[in-house]
């Protein structure tokens, strides 16, 4: 079954972001999506972390992501408590705003030494927020055979609010979808996957 009408994509967290965005960009390839706590409403899921990451960089890594990366390479193992949040933000920047003049390096949405917002780069991030992408890609979303969204009401990154905001945009654009909010946080939600996969299978199977 090679056609897009029989191909769906699902993911959680950053993978949930991809599950929302890839079908918008490639409706020729995918005909349904399921997103579990996908990154959305960037001003809530990313922006609040910038000050604490700037502090961590200042206090532990000389205000430099390069120093963070060098220290990580030399560490005997990956210490999530020490490296995780800052490294994740660096990875997001590599994905959203890669530096065309420095392959493998990002353009950062804030000054790592002070935390001061770089408005130009931040606006480029916001342009990639699923909530803001919904309207310009409404036709692609409207072509989906199934759109399923869920998130925990106690998600630490406020991705329940992101899912709700994306859902509200879909409703405003008259795009059919399902949103389920449940009691839970960001982790420990893999039990939600089978139900979403079942919905995709039912929508993508041969009639």
Regions found by a protein language model. Give the residues of each.
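Non-catalytic cap/lid and distal C-terminal segments of serine-dependent acyl enzymes
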Residues: 1-207
């Amino acid at each position: 079954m090679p056609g897009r009408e029989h191909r769906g994509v699902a993911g959680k967290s950053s993978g949930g972001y991809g599950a929302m965005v890839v079908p918008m960009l490639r409706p020729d390839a995918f005909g349904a999506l399921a997103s579990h706590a996908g990154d959305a409403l960037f001003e809530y899921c990313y922006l609040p972390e910038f000050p604490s990451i700037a502090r961590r960089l200042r206090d532990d890594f000389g205000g430099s992501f390069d120093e963070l990366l060098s220290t990580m390479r030399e560490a005997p193992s990956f210490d999530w408590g020490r490296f995780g949040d800052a490294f994740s933000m660096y990875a997001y920047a590599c994905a959203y705003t890669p530096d065309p003049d420095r392959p493998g390096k990002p353009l950062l949405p804030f000054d790592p030494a002070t935390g001061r917002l770089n408005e130009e780069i931040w606006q480029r991030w916001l342009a990639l927020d699923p909530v803001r992408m919904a309207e310009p890609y409404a036709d692609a979303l409207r072509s989906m055979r199934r759109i399923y969204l869920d998130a925990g009401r106690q998600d630490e990154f406020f991705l329940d609010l992101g899912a709700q905001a994306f859902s509200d945009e879909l409703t405003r654009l008259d795009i059919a979808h399902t949103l389920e909010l449940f009691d839970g946080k960001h982790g420990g939600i893999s039990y939600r996957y089978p139900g979403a996969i079942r919905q995709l299978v039912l929508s993508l199977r041969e009639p």
